[in-house]
Amino acid sequence: MLNKDQFADNHFIRTIIEEDLESGKHTAVQTRFPPEPNGYLHIGHAKSICLNFGLAYIYDGLCNLRFDDTNPEKENDEYVNAIKEDVEWLGFHWAGEPRFASNYFDQLYDYAVGLIKDGKAYVDDLTPEEMREYRGTLTEAGKNSPYRDRSVEENLDLFTRMKNGEFPDGSKTLRLKIDMASGNINMRDPVIYRIRRAHHHNTGDKWCIYPMYDYTHCISDAIEGITHSLCTLEFEAHRPLYDCVLDNIPAPHATRPRQYEFSRLELLYTITSKRKLNQLVVEKHVSGWDDPRMPTISGMRRRGYTPEGLRLFAKRAGISKSENIVDMSVLEGAIREELENSAPRLMAVLNPLKVTLTNFETGRTQSRRAAFHPNHEEMGEREVPISQTIYIEADDFAENPPKGFKRLIPGGEVRLRHGYVIKCDEVVKDEAGNVVELKCSIDHDTLGKNPEGRKVKGVIHWVSAEHAAEIKVRLYDRLFTVERPDAVRGEDGEYLPFTDFLNPESVKEITAYAEPAAKDLPAESRWQFERIGYFVTDRKDHGKDTPVFNRTVTLKDSWQPK
């Protein structure tokens, strides 16, 4: 359930919106989230989703979902469907049906014809190499194309023939006629159409010319009546072109959109480049786009992150124009905080050590009811059985304990969570000297109460060996060992391959044992394994016969760079 407190506090975009509403410039807020369907959404997109949909929610406006699908070779329906699923999973709903820039191709073409008729666009025959040469540099003005002064009639004829498929791919472009000497390179006669014979996921083979992003985006905003078009800072230099296009076409809507920029999220210890994420998938460094180590929304969902936790992270990351570098611990902290409140508890033992309770009757089973959550009675209770043989964590026993060790030691006592106080009477070892079993006695008078005359400080978790569910546990950790894996230079000053910094210990699969309540859980069921961390049943591989749990995050931030 959304509420207005879940979104970023007052920031400069909210100030702009409130001033626009107060002045009457706009009577309602209309935003949009405009992904290109050429990959899966990642954590950076989650921030943008929360911003655009969140602002619409806060100010009782609307937010469109629009697919900027102008690159047919890279886009497909798989990505479209995945994006829609991710947005809905995050808790948001778009206004009306999803939009596609490709739905506006006819209008975009008509506007281009109008620009030609007004002498503001021309067909160019320069090759890409020649165009780069004519474009100039940041310190040197560009040169006019020799085709810049074609007549309106010739340009209309050539553009029509481009549309009809009479010319080879890449042989001609349509360019805006602006200023080749502009200090902003984006304003040096930018290309707005190119010839590209490619099947389009939405329009099929209807078109062999496709509009460019800078031309399409602003017109799509205008058609949809967007009031505040929000994008990341790398588009700041494109804003003059955004305004220029809209200044030179008939207004498609009474509302004129305005572009505003905010800083891109940079999350440490990961990457968000779609190209590099795709490389990880193609080269099989990960199992797919939804691998729980990936920063994709589908990967984080499979890892066990919650929509509420991601919205909390987006709020804490904030919105500004300054550099937005955020440590992974901030993301993990937000997830941990949300799960602390929402995840029911179970006990599980990841590294089992056998314990025989010598004074517990052989063949007898006793059980005690325990709450699923200490602060949420509504989550109910479960039966926790105990039998003569139990498993505890091997780390919860030490023959030669370090200072301050409060768990089980030879001759020492510890309380079993939800159970008795036990005392270690004997340590059993194998031929190699490894501890393989503890023989302990229970204090029968300590079930649910403290022992008389002594204080037992340590409390450990455990499971009944007879009743435990055998589970598969995947212990996930950070995918990379350095903060910026794609920004490390070698001795020669060149960037090193980001794959050099993959964490070889980013996943480890083990067999563990959990309370019997773990046997019949549905997929995507999130739990706290007491004293260990937060886990989720895998949404793909989990089943009744083969329970699979993914570690979402540890109870505390224990990351140490490798």
Swiss-Prot record:
A Pfam family hit: tRNA-synt_1c_C
UniProt motif ('HIGH' region) ranges: 35-45
Catalytic reaction equation(s): tRNA(Gln) + L-glutamine + ATP = L-glutaminyl-tRNA(Gln) + AMP + diphosphate
Chain positions recorded as L-glutamine binding sites: 68, 213
Keywords: Aminoacyl-tRNA synthetase, ATP-binding, Cytoplasm, Ligase, Nucleotide-binding, Protein biosynthesis
Binding site for ATP: 36-38, 42-48, 232, 264-265
The name this protein goes by in its record: Glutamine--tRNA ligase
Taxonomic classification: Bacteria, Pseudomonadati, Pseudomonadota, Betaproteobacteria, Neisseriales
Name of the gene: glnS
